[in-house]
Amino acid sequence: MPVTRIDNNNAFLMAIGEGSRIEVHGADAEKESWTQLNQSAERGENVLQLELATGWEVGDRIAIASTGANMGDAEERTIVEVRDGGRAVVLDQPLANDHFGDVQTYQNGKSGQDAREWTVDQRAEVALLSRNVTIQGDEDSTEDGYGGHSMVMDGADMHISGAEFARMGQEGALGRYPLHWHLQADVSGQYVENSSIHHSYNKGITIHGTQNAWLEDNVVFDTIGHGYFLEDGAEFGNVLIDNLGFVQRAADNVREAPIASDATAVSSFWIQNPDNHLIGNRAAGSDHSGFWIISREAVIDQSAETGLYDGYVPRDQAFGVFEGNVAHANNQSALRIGGQVDETTGVVSPNTPFHITQRDGQNNAVDYVIQDFEGYKSGGDAVWVRGFGGSFEDMILADNGRATFLRGLQTIEDSLIVGASDNDDGSPIRGGERHGVSLYDEALAIRDSHFAGFSGTDDGAFSQHIGVDNSTRHSVENVTFENDGTNPFTNRDRQGITDEQGTFSVGLVDIDGSITGTPGQILTPRIDDVGGQFVTVDEPGFNAGQGATYDPSIGAWVNPVGTTIGVLEHTSTSVPMTVTRSDGPQLSNLNADDRTEFLVFADQDLIYTVDHQGAPDSRFSVDVTDLPRGASVILRYVDLPANTSIQGADSVGSLDALMQATGSSVFRDGGDTYLKLVATELDYDSSSGSPAIDQRSYSDSITVISGGGRDRGDEVDEPRDLDRTVPYGTVDADDSMRPERAPSTSDTMDIAPGDARWSDTSVWDGSAPGADDIVFVGEGETLVLDIDAEVAGIIVNGGALIVEDTQDIDLITDYLLVINEGLFQVGQEDSPHQNDFTLTLEGDDPTADINLEPFLGLTGIEIV
């Protein structure tokens, strides 16, 4: 069905319908799209030493990325001289900021085959902004934010190489982006490569409801909103290789942003489906995150409205290749996996069900590999993951507030984590301290990795997170520390807060003695005093088992081999409680809105006395986790109501019988209620693969109800809501996953001797079109643009508009529309455009409607 109307649209380059195509091939694709500094460039200098012979020329416009924590340290300059075969350029103005340009090496201090060296490369990226083919919005757009936009839809094709898109995008308008595949489904063979998008008012490159697009060697610089934007979750199989995005700015507010995440979660690479390939890309500064792989439960918005993706769950899809990517100078994170943003309110939700899930759609461990990722100068966490599973291999994380915040069942292998490197420029770190691996929900395994630069008073290679659901089964194996005063462990959260119950529920198993010198010992944090808002330490030592010693050089309690540690949690407990261990340590004022949590030592003849500081809830559950099968913990509750019933434990007649019981048991002795929890329910498989700790974690759950009734043994009516039985561990990267580029589908034309020429007045019956005219190119006609021109609009209806490559040409128009198998062409793949060509999209009326019906009956080349 032919297109008959274009409503509320202006300043566009658009192709609609199968067979319609936009072909732009500029000769500047032969230049390097971006490179890095080869040595540091300091403030006041005006010469850049570059890694590559770039092919850049005098007059080219470039941008130098920030290498500090502030993306705003990026700056633009014009080249006035080229030296050393293109490996050095002289700038029109001195630099206003320092830009780091050195590499650093770290070694694990071992010899022979065990030796390992890591290279930290924080050299500034330098990007080419200008190209000889330019598509741009008008100058007024710098005031009103109404630039041009380009789009292909309904089966049209787009092949872009060596082009510059400047002052594009229309601020606050959904769908009005600089470059945009719109609901295209499979576009195998289409690409955007070695092009630049800069000073955009609405994102960079958009892939929307489209699969198998190819983006390579592009630069997206200084945008409002996301840089590389995969829009609805229906985008998969797309390949992004060696692209650079930096200075992605947040929209002013949610109300005015086209989507709310542009204001609250803006990212250089916004990926709403893990089934895409990202290789060698760089995110060099955004107001939120570098890379964010969002967890979508369903395809949303216009893609969902097509009906093509009913029942398709983006977050359940297998990961594509994620390898060799780098992110820095991001206000929050270098890499985020999981979580979700409400695109109406802008609220970021990290919690279930917003986890990357894969598998069978349940909240299980996920098999994926993050390979060779480098993240530095992140204001928050370099790597932030919500969801279980995954392997992080050969990472380099440096100069971040916190290196990792992983949900659990993940491995970190062959990685380097640095608190402060040689590129520590004194930028303030949130909270004032640097932490490496944050120990959180389920077990993490850290192997064959090196830590350096954590020498500040409250710095630590390992730290615990303050929230609940922490694990005592984190493990390290073959980890090493730089001889620079690095602290292995800090008992503080990254923000310096130690006043939550998660502080008391962390354990780190030293499998091979990497930290303690003795294989199998377990580190737990020493907490002697906290502020008292959520918990008060009355008697210290709660986190130390029998025989534990405190090692100040490590910063933690060292528990002897064989110590069994679990986590005890009370849910639905709004009443503060005091917990006293039978050998003396005591916590009081334990309170939270929905649960409390603390560490317990199993099978040590210890009894934990729980005394509610008021009437307990009428119903609460008691869970113990992170224990080997059959391990037990004994609790004594003081003055529970007489009519309290216990679900999940068998009644026994004496305390001795309870002590000897092999299953979960309850014994009442006057006002005291004794509970024995025995871990028999498989929770998850550990990743350690070492006999130093049991490879499986078990749990138990008992429900306490006030209000009468009998004790009901194992009839627990609230099953655990999390299936964590999927084994996790090292995931092998599959080379078969690496994408192969589909053959190009570019379809261009040669200019023929008899083709009509814009400069030929006979084509126009003696009067060339003017600024108020619309040019129509009908089916079978070819119009060659060979001179500068300014018109109100151009409609290519089945014909072709080809820009001749004999001189520099400027074309100004409100819009250029290609329909019904028409073609707009600048250069060809095997013969790129050599001269300068600039298309300026000057339309500035967002309410403009174009009624095409009067044109569809026309033939030939006409002025309308």
Locate each region found by the language model.
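Acidic/polar low-complexity surface segments
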Residues: P2-F12, R21, D28-Q36, L129-E143, ...
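Short beta-strand-centered aromatic/proline hotspots
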Residues: D73-R83
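Short "repeat-start/strand-capping" segments in structured domains, especially the N-termini
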Residues: A156-H159, S188-E193, T210-E216, A234-G237, ...
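Acidic Gly/Asp/Thr-rich repetitive segments characteristic of extracellular carbohydrate-active
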Residues: E51-R61, S746-E779
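Right-handed parallel beta-helix/beta-solenoid
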Residues: D717-G766
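Extracellular beta-helix/beta-solenoid repeat scaffolds
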Residues: M1-Q36, G55-E75, A88-V152, A156-M158, ...
